[in-house]
Curated annotation (Swiss-Prot):
Any GO CC annotation of this UniProt entry: membrane
Biased composition (Polar residues): 50-81
InterPro entries xref list: KCT2 (IPR037645)
Designated name of the protein: Keratinocyte-associated transmembrane protein 2
């Protein structure tokens, strides 16, 4: 796109400056300067992106001296620019391929080395237990001798075990006491309960009757005492009794009376 635009501008300038020889020299110089100014940013960008391509692009674009009023043609510019663009596209498209290519040989090398490495590892593992046994037999661990003195921290688990054993004994004793105290069957419990209920009801009835008839009971007991102890059954007593009954006939109705 830049080459076509530059070609169009150069053709228009050539047509305008064609009338005189002096004008042709000035026009050629002006065109060379304009082309140089236009191509400077393009060349800078090309150098930053692809340094090897700068030599190919910068070689044809050479500004001639003021004495020689010649400048490169548009065809040369287009031909010099097109390989650069082609090389850019080719480099961009071919850039990922070199990264993918070395991976395959590395994988093949890994696959070729894996069996041998695995065999070596297996041999090392098979040979390592023997050395471990030898070191265990010899007792040389590369460490100082173990101090067999008792440590208070080491005694803590024993205290814990003693406490646990005591708790287990207490729990077993509690279980034994619970097993000893067994409740009777439900039928026996019901029968005993009914029997106790009858006894309690009888006692309550006796207390109730005696409380409400306490005066009568007291009079009955006292009258018997008077008759048995104090009042003798003599002739005088019978006469007095007859006289009282005759004088008070209403006393015959009641037997309980006090003299």
């Amino acid at each position: 796109m830049a080459a076509s635009a530059l070609g169009r501008m150069c053709g228009a300038a050539r047509e305008k400056l064609s009338p005189g020889p002096g004008a042709r020299g000035l026009g050629a110089l002006a065109r060379s300067l304009v082309l140089a100014l236009l191509l400077v940013p393009v060349l800078c960008s090309d150098r930053s992106e692809n340094p090897p391509n700068n030599a190919t692009v910068s070689s044809p674009v050479v500004v001639t001296a003021p004495g020689n009023h010649t400048s490169p043609s548009v065809s040369q510019i287009s031909t010099t620019l097109s390989p650069a663009s082609a090389e850019k596209s080719g480099s961009s498209s071919a850039a990922p391929t070199p990264t993918a290519a070395p991976s395959a040989p590395e994988e093949e090398a890994d696959s070729n080395e894996d069996p041998s490495m695995e065999e070596e590892d297996l041999l090392a593992l098979n040979s390592s237990p023997a050395t471990g046994k030898d070191t265990l037999d010899n007792g040389d661990y590369g460490e100082p001798d173990y101090d067999w003195t008792t440590n208070p921290r080491d005694e803590e688990p024993e205290d814990i075990n003693i406490a646990i054993s005591k708790e287990s004994r207490r729990f077993r004793g509690f279980q034994d006491s619970v097993e000893v105290v067994k409740l009777p069957p439900p039928n026996r419990e019901d029968s005993h309960f009914f029997f106790h209920l009858l006894i309690f009801a009888f006692c309550a009835a006796v207390v109730y009757v005696t409380y409400h008839n306490k005066r009568k009971i007291f009079l009955l007991v006292q009258s018997r005492k008077w008759r048995d102890g104090l009042c003798s059954k003599t002739v005088e007593y019978h006469r007095l009794d007859q006289n009282v009954n005759e004088a008070m006939p209403s006393l015959k109705i009641t037997n309980d009376y006090i003299f």
